[in-house]
């Protein structure tokens, strides 16, 4: 029997889909990239914004048509939307055979077998204690591994559904993570990314309430074949001086931080239940840029959060101008049922104002990007080739500080270190030509 997995959302979802695929292959199922060939279709959903949920609903409808043609087709839905909607999905969509949660992904083999027996069900049991380093996976990349080190989030930002769909923070044992890093190192992997909804909270639940992400990075760096270590996603006020120094001093730690600000207004940050002020955030960015050589910093912002005035928005604009991020992700505020903001804060900023502010920030960031990218012109940079950038024979890779470079190459060099000379800059990627193969 063949299976197909459709993944929406974040890197953690991608990692969990890799795990589900690996477990199903171990059970004797065969993976297919064509849903029309599949006997089992799994949807790994996202609930961060309404748009992501709508994509899931569209997928359910589309695969439901396949089920009309193949009555034996099994359709399962997991991920954050499944955790949020639970049994309602079974009631609303009669073509769904089973629904499962975010903390029992490792039980997917048993869940599929139950579904094959013909009974519809929902299962949201917690199986995180069963997660370990040797769980089978089907990695997308042959050189870059994604490793989830902490599950859940305790922050309860007023707009965010994640604490309700992912649960409380739970860190994996450090020795288990290191054994997983070792397994990838033995396979020749060059890059790893440590994942978590709040990755710099790793280890705080071990007893002393101190983050141990810095120590984890140091231990992972001991493996010779591992050349780059990344981590996503950070919570600004949880970034420690020790972590900054580890990134500054450990040559294998990527000199890149993703620090979601969400707003530049103290009034809005308080309404969002973010645990820092604009002044503290700017101070953190300045500290990172001072301590870590050639570092880049990216961020996230929400436009049109309830009660956001023009003055609040101008404070966000000013923060972006001061911090000069390498990249920003921007989203219009999307009310999420079940969150504090949905219950207690009126969605009072008109849609067209949300979009106008989003477009303004995008144009501002483009100008900043172009100015910041000028220093790379005619410079030689080291990248790892990731794969194709398009259909015209171009490939892409990233520098140690997360600059995206596009160049002509060939598939045989995927996963290899290359030196590329930058000959064109844009507000987005840089363009160049390969100088030589380094390894």
Curated annotation (Swiss-Prot):
Any one of the GO CC terms: cytosol
GO molecular function, one term: N6-isopentenyladenosine methylthiotransferase activity
Assigned EC number: 2.8.4.3
Domain MTTase N-terminal: from-to ranges: 1-117
Reactions catalysed according to its record: N(6)-dimethylallyladenosine(37) in tRNA + (sulfur carrier)-SH + AH2 + 2 S-adenosyl-L-methionine = 2-methylsulfanyl-N(6)-dimethylallyladenosine(37) in tRNA + (sulfur carrier)-H + 5'-deoxyadenosine + L-methionine + A + S-adenosyl-L-homocysteine + 2 H(+)
Cofactor note: Binds 2 [4Fe-4S] clusters. One cluster is coordinated with 3 cysteines and an exchangeable S-adenosyl-L-methionine.
Ranges of residues in domain Radical SAM core: 139-371
Cofactors that this protein relies on: [4Fe-4S] cluster
Family matches, as Pfam families: Radical_SAM (PF04055), TRAM (PF01938), UPF0004 (PF00919)
Record-listed [4Fe-4S] cluster 2 binding positions: 153, 157, 160
Localization terms from the record: Cytoplasm
Family: Belongs to the methylthiotransferase family. MiaB subfamily.
Protein role: Catalyzes the methylthiolation of N6-(dimethylallyl)adenosine (i(6)A), leading to the formation of 2-methylthio-N6-(dimethylallyl)adenosine (ms(2)i(6)A) at position 37 in tRNAs that read codons beginning with uridine.
Subunit structure and binding partners: Monomer.
Protein name: tRNA-2-methylthio-N(6)-dimethylallyladenosine synthase
Lineage, top ranks: Bacteria, Thermotogati, Thermotogota, Thermotogae, Petrotogales
């Amino acid at each position: 029997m063949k299976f197909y997995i459709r993944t929406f959302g974040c890197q953690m979802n991608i990692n969990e889909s890799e795990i589900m695929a690996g477990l199903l292959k171990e059970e004797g199922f065969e993976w297919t990239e064509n849903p029309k060939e599949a006997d089992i279709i799994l949807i790994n959903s996202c609930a961060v914004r309404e748009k992501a949920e709508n994509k899931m609903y569209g997928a359910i409808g589309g695969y439901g048509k396949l089920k009309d043609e193949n009555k034996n087709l099994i359709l399962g839905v997991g991920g954050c939307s499944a955790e949020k909607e639970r049994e309602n999905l079974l009631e609303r969509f009669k073509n769904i055979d089973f629904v499962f949660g975010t903390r029992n992904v490792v039980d997917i083999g048993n869940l599929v077998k139950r579904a094959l027996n013909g009974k519809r069900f929902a299962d949201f049991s917690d199986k995180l204690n069963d997660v370990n380093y040797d769980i089978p996976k089907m990695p997308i990349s042959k050189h870059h591994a994604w490793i989830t080190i902490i599950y859940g989030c305790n922050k309860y930002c007023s707009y965010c559904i994640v604490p309700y769909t992912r649960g409380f923070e739970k860190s994996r044992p450090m020795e288990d993570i290191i054994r997983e890093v070792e397994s990838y190192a033995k396979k020749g992997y060059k890059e790893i990314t440590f994942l978590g909804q709040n990755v710099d909270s790793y280890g705080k639940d071990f007893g002393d309430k101190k983050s141990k992400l810095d120590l984890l990075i140091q231990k992972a760096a001991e493996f010779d074949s591992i050349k780059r270590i990344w981590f996503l996603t950070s919570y600004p006020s949880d970034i420690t001086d020790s972590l900054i120094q580890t990134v500054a001093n450990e040559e294998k730690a990527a000199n890149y931080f993703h620090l979601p600000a969400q707003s530049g207004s103290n009034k809005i940050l308080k309404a969002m239940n973010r645990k820092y002020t604009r002044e503290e955030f700017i101070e953190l960015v300045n500290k990172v840029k001072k301590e870590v050589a050639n570092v880049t910093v990216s961020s996230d912002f929400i436009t049109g959060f309830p009660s956001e005035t023009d003055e609040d928005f101008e404070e966000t604009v000013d923060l972006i101008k001061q911090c000069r991020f390498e990249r920003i992700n921007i989203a219009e505020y999307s009310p999420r049922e079940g969150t504090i903001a949905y219950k207690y804060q009126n969605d009072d900023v008109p849609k067209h104002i949300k979009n106008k502010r989003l477009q303004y920030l995008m144009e501002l960031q483009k100008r900043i990007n172009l100015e910041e990218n000028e220093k790379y012109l005619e410079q030689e940079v080291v990248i790892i080739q990731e794969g194709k950038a398009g259909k015209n024979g171009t490939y892409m890779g990233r520098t140690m500080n997360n600059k995206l470079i596009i160049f002509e190459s060939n598939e045989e060099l995927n996963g290899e270190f290359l030196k590329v000379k930058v000959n064109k800059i844009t507000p987005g990627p840089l363009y160049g030509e390969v100088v030589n193969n380094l390894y």
